[in-house]
Amino acid sequence: MSTTSKKLAVFDAANAMLLLWRRAGDHMTEDELDWFAEGAPDLVQLQADYIANITQGLGCLISNDASSGALSERYDVSTVLWNVSHQVGVLGALTSVARDAGFLAQHKKQAKAKGGRAGA
C-alpha cells in the first residue's frame, strides 16, 4: 500500500529534482547556487545535442533498413520514445533549477552587498 501524498506529481527524475530543489534551494550557499546556475546550461546543451544525434540516428536506422531487426519488437519504439521523453523532461527541470539558482544567487549577493541577509 502506498503512503505517498496524492498532492505529489508522478515520480520521475524531473519531478524528483524539482521537489528537492524547492526544498533545498533557499538553504544553499552562493557558491552552490552559482555551481547550478553556471554548470547546468552546459550540461543541458550537451545532453540536448546528444539526444538530437541519437534520435536522428535512430530515424535513419529505421527508415533505411527496415529489415535489420532494429526496433522490430512491438514495444521497442515506444520504449525508446518514453526514454527520450524522460530525458527531455530532466533537461527541462535542470534548466528550471539553473534559472532559479541564478536568481537566488543574485538575490543573496545583493542582500550581502546591502549588509543584510537574503530572505530576511
Please provide the spans of the model-predicted regions.
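Sequence/structural signature of long amphipathic alpha-helices
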Residues: 1-120
